[in-house]
Each structure stands twice: as structure tokens, then as C-alpha cells.
Amino acid sequence: MRQALPLVTRQGDRIAIVSGLRTPFARQATAFHGIPAVDLGKMVVGELLARSEIPADAIEQLVFGQVVQMPKAPNIAREIVLGTGMNVHTDAYSVSRACATSFQAVANVAESLMAGTIRAGIAGGADSSSVLPIGVSKALARVLVDVNKARTTRQRLTLFSRLRLRDLLPVPPAVAEYSTGLRMGDTAEQMAKTYGITREQQDALAHRSHQRAAQAWAEGKLAEEVMTTYVPPYKNPFAEDNNIRGASTLADYAKLRPAFDRKHGSVTAANSTPLTDGAAAVILMTESRAKELGLHPLGYLRSYAFTAIDVWQDMLLGPAWSTPLALERAGLTMADLTLFDMHEAFAAQTLANLQLLGSERFAREVLGRAQATGEVDDAKFNVLGGSIAYGHPFAATGARMITQTLHELRRRGGGFGLVTACAAGGLGAAMVLEAE
């Protein structure tokens, strides 16, 4: 094992995560229908600051992400600063790493803290699958550019006459990988077939996710980290995730047909994460700054790792690659962890990564490591459920996982937790967290 890389400032301060918050997550076109991601981001950051009682000028940087970006607000981070009453001089910029976007935002703020350029910052992400940038066809887009340069009405009419009726149809955002044309569900089907993951195993994991999430809400474990929201016409509160199946039964999952490979597939809408709207954010600062402000951190960022693999086959294996690297940098092994939380993009993807984490052959032949990362103890794995139940607003999921894991570590008396996610483009992310 290589030497651990301590995540500390020049003065030896640890990177503290002092608080975290998210909106409830809503299925597409339900509670947050018509609410853009930038407004969801403003909601969560404004409430996070209000609850923390941190002086507004204490936050020196905001790094925020959005995967499905809107042309009207390309820098969501800056819009959040301007729309929440934060100091107008607060540095703010946006990031995107697909489903690992808020992992990246957290890492960026942590790096600023370690560099000594700031002492406190906010990281997070928001996405809306209900407010989408509906585009136009390539043919219409080209004509519109040319029309803008045309000098006469006749020239403009000539340009428009080249269009066919189909060229006028709206174009929704792409759901496939740009480089391969494969949808995420197609990749999940690849992984199910490659690693021999059955439909029954996938449905069982989805059922488990919903059961755990429903239990977490019933026991009040999420109340502190999920805000109550009000949206126009501001009559009814929305306070709990609305995708969770409170009365989940395995028999219900078996009724659904495959969603991607309709003849021979096993990936369904029920064992996949749904399109979701929501936002989440965390406040990070140096350990000494937290003490100055009289704050008691939720926990600390011990290490992080980002990885990338090929996109043509089984590209959602990011956790199997990034987890051993994050553990190594933290100076820990799988056995040292109290909790292990993995983003459930699909049940097939989750089960494939779990399988490879325990595989000696994968470790030796693919990762070039002497031994497997380690089997994940079911008693430590996604103990409060995962994205299949909660939903997945792309840029917000990482911040949800970090906040949720730190709260659960504290309930258990402290320890180490690892959070990890796959992402489009063959990317992977993992972070080791510590709570006392």
C-alpha cells in the first residue's frame, strides 16, 4: 500500500464539513414541476445558511454544479450567490462531472481550503428533469443563424423554404453517451450480462433500497437534513421524498417489463433510479475556522479519488476503480469502514461494482493490485437505502450521500464512511469521511 495522503491545510487543519442540507427529492413533473435547478439551488443554500447561523461574509467561495444546464443561467453558482443575499463579492463558479458533480464541488472547495485561499466555502449541486433545455434540430439551428445574417426578406424566406416539417420538431436533451450513442440503461444491461446479475437480484436490491429509505423516514433519521419547501402557489409544503415506495413488495417488481433490452433484458424502471428534481449542499471550512465560529463539525473529509475508464463496455464501474484509491489515500482498508454508501444508478450497476470490489482476479488483472479491495459487509452497505429509492437529481446526489453518511456515523458514535458513485463518461468518484 502506498503512503496515505493527509487532507490538511498548510497549518495542519483538517477539512471540516460543518453542515449539510437538501431539498426533498421529487420525481420528474411532480412537486417541483416548473421549478428550474437554479431556484432549487437558491432554496437549499439560503436555508442552509439560515440554519447554520454563520455570518454571511464568512463564506468566501461557492462551488455548485448542474448537469442538465440551462442556457439562461450557465453559471448556476454565481446566480445562487446573487439570489440568496450572500456577499456579492463571494467567489462562485460552476462544475460538472455528470452524476459525481457535487463530489467534484466538494473536492474543489477542499482544495481551496488546503491552498489557503479561503477558510470557508459551500459546495453542492442541483438538477431539474422537469425544466429542460428543449432544443431545435440541427437544420433549423443552422437556418436560424443564417437568417440572422440575411439582409433581405427574400433571402430569409429562401432559407426557411429549405426546411422540412420534421426540422421544426423540438429536440429534447440527449439521454445517450455522446461518444458511443449508448443510453445509461444500455450500459446497465451490458453489466448485468457480463457479471451474471439476474433480474431477481436486481429487484431484490431495489426492494431493499425502498425498505431502508422508508424506514429511515419513519424513524425520523432524515428530518434534520431535509428542508421543507414551498413552491408556487405556496399553499402546500413539500417535505419528504416522493419516490420512496412505503409499501414495497417484491411481487410488484416482477410485473414490470424490461425498459431497454425489451426482449432479453432485466433492467426495468423499478430497479433503476428515476428522473428526479432536487438540490443539496454542504458547508466546508478549516477545522480552526470552525472552532473560531463555535461550530461542531458533522465530520471531516479524509480523502477523495476520481477515476476514468473506457466507455464502450461496462462503463459504470467507477466505484470499483475509485474506492481502492480513496481508501489507500486515507490509509485505510475496507475493514476499517463503519459505513459504505454507493450511488445506485441501477441495481445491475451497483451489484456489479460490489462483485468486483471483492474480486481478487479483478484486482490483479485490471487494477494491478495484489489483493481485492474487499467484500462489502451488507450490514454497512447503503444502510438508509440509496438512489433507487430517494431518486437522483444528478448534481445533488453526492452532497446527499455525504450529509446522510456523516449523520449516520454520528448516530453510531463515529468512525469512517466511504461514499462512491459512477458517472457518465466512464468516470468514478469516492470519498472517505470521518466522524467523531
From Swiss-Prot:
PROSITE patterns: THIOLASE_1 (PS00098), THIOLASE_2 (PS00737), THIOLASE_3 (PS00099). It comes from Salmonella paratyphi A (strain AKU_12601). GO terms for cellular component: cytosol. Keywords: Acyltransferase, Cytoplasm, Fatty acid metabolism, Lipid degradation, Lipid metabolism, Transferase. Belongs to the thiolase-like superfamily. Thiolase family. It is an enzyme of class 2 (transferase). InterPro entries: Ac-CoA_C-AcTrfase_FadI, Thiolase, Thiolase-like, Thiolase_acyl_enz_int_AS, Thiolase_AS, Thiolase_C, Thiolase_CS, Thiolase_N. This is 3-ketoacyl-CoA thiolase. GO terms for molecular function: acetyl-CoA C-acyltransferase activity. The keyword Lipid metabolism applies. It is found in: Cytoplasm.
